[in-house]
From Swiss-Prot:
Its cofactor is a divalent metal cation. It comes from the Bacteria. One of its GO terms (biological process) is isopentenyl diphosphate biosynthetic process, methylerythritol 4-phosphate pathway. InterPro entries: IspD (IPR001228), IspD/F (IPR026596), IspD/TarI (IPR034683), ISPD_synthase_CS (IPR018294), MECDP_synthase (IPR003526), MECDP_synthase_CS (IPR020555), MECDP_synthase_sf (IPR036571), Nucleotide-diphossugar_trans (IPR029044). This is Bifunctional enzyme IspD/IspF. One of its GO terms (molecular function) is metal ion binding. Residues 1-248 are annotated as: 2-C-methyl-D-erythritol 4-phosphate cytidylyltransferase. The record marks R27, K36, H281, T380 as: Transition state stabilizer. Residues 249-409 are annotated as: 2-C-methyl-D-erythritol 2,4-cyclodiphosphate synthase. PROSITE patterns: ISPD, ISPF. Its EC number is 2.7.7.60, 4.6.1.12. 4-CDP-2-C-methyl-D-erythritol 2-phosphate binds at D255, V256, H257, H281, S282, D303, I304, G305, T379, T380, N381, E382, F386, R389. Disulfide bonds: none annotated.
Amino acid sequence: MQAQSLAEVTVISKAAAVIVAAGRGERAGQSAEGPKQYRLIGAEAVLARTLRAFTDCPLIGTIAVVIHPDDHALYRRAVPEKHENVILVTGGPTRQESTRLGLLALKDEAPQYVLIHDGVRPFIGQDLLERIIANLTPDNGVLPALAVSDTLKRAAADGMVETTISRTGLFAAQTPQAFPYAPILDAHEKAFAINRTDFTDDAAIAEWQEIAVRIIEGSADNTKLTWAKDIEMADKRLRQDHAVFPDIRTGNGYDVHSFEPGDHVTLCGVKIPHEAKLNGHSDADVALHALTDALLATRGAGDIGTHFPPSDPQWKGAASRIFIEHAAKIVREAGGRIANVDVTLISEAPKIGPHRAAMTQALCDMLGIAADRVSIKATTNEKLGFVGRREGIAAIATATVIYPGEVPE
């Protein structure tokens, strides 16, 4: 059967994908950032860059990302965006088993084709993805590979050269390796059933089960990050590619709410016992309201009242988490990354200190950023003005966001 055109593939079915990212990356050494798939290259986690290549491809539907059971927090930090077509799968003790579990997670959907990719190949390009899918048929899988160009030597046990190996017909395999879904799942299940764990890639399992695999030209850019030096070179490459003055934007927000009878206030999404509550159309979370305005300001996107007018009854009593997550979504959709948020609460009471850790964590969860990028401070008004008279609470917020591109001249 001949390879299909991209248009034909799009009409017939979107391919699914399995991104395998459950390894420990021991050869890359230890890092405070975690295993190598979570290390930063060009200020972005390796896995986040890898995943984006697949979410950006219109020919790919559901994506199963297979991660280690201990890595859920690392994943949320690396990939704060929520993608409707991405599912998280807990991996197994080996890459082969993690791949099988990723394939099983797609079983109810039963896609026509599936691409299986290493999570630490972050430079996979759209052209290669499209060529792989275009060459898939129900009768064959596709393996991107590069013809071996270096002279190959076989060494004896003592390290001395034993013989030279012909390069003719030899290729270095890459990923994603793509297959008709049902046959490759069946092959993995058969290997699992007899405890065969010695396959070095998915194409080898396909060969074992006599699934035809077509080799197409891979990409020299599509390198696998194995060693610490690979990660260093990848980071250097990206920084050189983007050696321009970054588009760093800062937004400010201010809000104030008065007290009324009640038994708690809500600040940064955390309920704090108090002798009064804040008066407002929503939950009156003065901190989140100020921060929402600050984030919107980095896009010139108006203020909280523009997006959630107090005249609209649907926002009566609403949790302000809705507002801040909406603002963060606007930032992300523009390619922005939140570098830092700073909130200052101005109040005589209640005391903020005992609740600062919970408030910080709440903001981390809402914005998908690390705790060292969140600052929450409190001060009194030295008994001056409405704050000094304990009539309400004010908040000032600042957000710093990095957007793609450079500052225009």
